[in-house]
Design a protein with these regions (language model features):
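Ribokinase/PfkB-type carbohydrate-kinase core domain
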Residues: 1-185
Length: 185
């Protein structure tokens, strides 16, 4: 297997870390992604959990420096159960929101319910996804979960959110348009 000692450990350059921390008060949101690059175990004896915790330690510094900062986790197809576990147990509790598609949601549902992947009822997909989203929201404590696939978007938000449903809908429409344009390119 291919092993890149930097890119597949989510190592942030010291220059980036210093710069982001210096200017973090100018940001309202910070998107966290890239966990699909991790490996479960590394030749040096470290694990994905070591690098997940290292990244979260830095994100905590950003939040301490600028408490209003919102952290958004954008999911991707993750290659190993150990990484999914690390995301569910360590990453999501630190996030304010997340975005994911049906494949990624199915992994979370599988993990939460101790089921095999792709056990969804093809005739009741929306019900399956919606119940899985609610279960994930309850377990994770996330304020917002954005579910997106080619057929529809669903956004679960906590009632304590200060953003109106109309503004949430407008944001979802905009993201749908952008995603559609990217598909055409």
């Amino acid at each position: 297997p291919c092993w890149n000692p930097v890119n597949n450990k989510l190592l942030l350059s010291p220059l980036f870390k210093k710069g982001a921390l210096r200017f973090i008060d100018q940001f309202s949101h910070f998107i966290v992604a890239g966990y699909q690059l991790l490996l479960p175990n590394y030749p040096d004896g470290t694990t994905c959990i070591d690098y997940i915790l290292s990244t979260l330690s830095y994100l905590n510094k950003l939040k301490v420096a600028h408490p209003p900062l919102k952290l958004h986790f954008e999911c991707d197809t993750i290659p190993a159960d150990e990484i999914w576990y690390g995301i569910r147990k360590h990453v999501l509790p630190q996030m304010d929101s997340m975005g994911l598609n049906e494949v990624e949601l199915d992994y979370f549902i599988k993990d939460m319910r101790s089921q095999k992947i792709n056990q969804l009822d093809q005739e009741n997909q929306v019900k399956y996804y919606l119940s899985g989203l609610i279960e994930l929201a309850n377990e994770s404590g996330l304020e917002r979960i954005h579910f997106h696939n080619f057929d529809y978007y669903i956004c679960l938000t906590k009632g304590s959110q200060k953003i109106s449903p109309k503004r949430t809908r407008q944001a979802m429409i905009l993201s749908s348009i952008i995603a559609g344009q990217e598909q055409e390119a």
